[in-house]
């Protein structure tokens, strides 16, 4: 099973979503590099995909989708307005907690966000 570090970046009642070209919305994240901790991978992927820096990622849940295990971290950022699409990401957007279920997002993303919201 592949491991993926997935990030829920929550700010002011909104969650940050990313989208690759011609893809559905998802949460920032990606593969864990050899020798890299899950938390370090989460922070690196957030920075590489959105330009945002976070610290103190909180491990909140694990979610299996097919052959991928999402290790989900919650982070807070001070510079939320600076989010921008970088590298393979075509768009970034903040959506209100309640709007997440209506997004054209992957099934895994919707399930992870739903689990996160139940914790609040």
Question: What residues fall within each predicted segment?
Answer:
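Structural detector for helix-capping/boundary residues
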Residues: 13, 30, 44, 95-98
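Residue-level detector of high-confidence beta-strand sites
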Residues: 18, 60-62
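A short local loop/turn or secondary-structure capping micro-motif enriched for an aromatic residue
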Residues: 24-27, 92
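Conserved N-terminal beta-strand and adjoining loop/helix that marks the start
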Residues: 1-15
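The catalytic Nudix box helix
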Residues: 27-60
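Active-site-adjacent beta-strand/loop module that shapes the phosphate/pyrophosphate-binding cleft
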Residues: 63-99, 108-120
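Short, charged/polar surface micro-motifs in flexible loops or helix N-caps
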Residues: 13-15, 22-24, 33, 66-68, ...
